[in-house]
């Protein structure tokens, strides 16, 4: 089994619509670190699990320097991870989103 991990850094803003008071309800930004994990039993004709540049381009185009609320209705780390997972193709089995040094979320199948 082959596994590749693509790490992508983006800057984006968002706010959360929470049922309680929180500073996260105000528009603010993060320097996200996104890790996309892909695997396959075999390599494609180019000798790769997948083309990591296509994954990076899709994520950067969707997220970098954007307001995430315009893309994802409630852009929590968890919802962002699922959205990235859905963008990343059939070889993707896990996505890890780092919002801050102390806050990470993982979505995996």
PLM segments and residue spans:
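Charge-rich, low-complexity N-terminal segments
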Residues: 1-109
């Amino acid at each position: 089994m082959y596994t590749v991990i693509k790490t992508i850094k983006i800057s984006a803003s968002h706010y959360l619509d929470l049922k309680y008071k929180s500073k996260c309800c105000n528009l603010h930004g993060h320097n996200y670190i996104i890790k996309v994990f892909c695997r396959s039993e075999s390599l494609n004709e180019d000798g790769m699990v997948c083309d990591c540049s296509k994954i990076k381009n899709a994520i950067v185009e969707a997220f970098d320097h954007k307001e995430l609320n315009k893309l994802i209705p409630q852009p929590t780390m968890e919802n962002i991870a699922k959205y990235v997972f859905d963008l990343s193709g059939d070889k993707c089995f896990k996505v890890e989103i780092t919002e801050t040094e102390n806050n990470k979320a993982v979505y995996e199948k």
